[in-house]
A protein has these predicted regions:
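Double-stranded RNA-binding/processing signature
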Residues: 1-121
């Protein structure tokens, strides 16, 4: 879960940067936009899509599965247990890529997520 802890921060800052660069508005409006990207429900949806489309490498999938299956006593607000597990797996992959300094792959995955996000808007 340490990878997910780091990955949560990385994913959050990338989401904030994306919103700040691409949307105008008051801070409260920008925060709401960021929330639609970083919520456990949204992350779970993005991860399901990536799994269905075989976006993850073999190593990333191992990290994802290990994090998803880890016993965790926390629970996300407004998300099911399964959504929370999917989101935790996504965050772990982001943490892994960041710590491996694989910034190109991190950006590639985030761009894929943003493409999915923009299609839903």
């Amino acid at each position: 879960l340490t990878l997910a802890y780091i990955g949560d921060s990385i994913y959050d800052i990338m989401s904030r940067e994306y919103v700040m660069k691409n949307h105008l508005g008051k801070i409260n409006e920008l925060h709401k936009k960021v929330s639609t990207i970083v919520s456990a429900r949204a992350q779970a949806s993005f991860m399901e899509n990536m799994l269905e489309n075989n976006i993850l490498t073999e190593d990333e999938e191992k990290i994802y599965n290990r994090a998803k299956n880890q016993k965790n006593n926390s629970k996300a607000k407004n998300a099911s247990i399964m959504e929370y597990k999917l989101a935790t797996g996504l965050e772990a992959v982001f943490g892994y890529l960041y710590l491996e300094k694989n910034f190109e792959r991190l950006e590639e995955m985030f761009n894929y997520i943003i493409k999915l996000y923009e299609e839903k808007q």
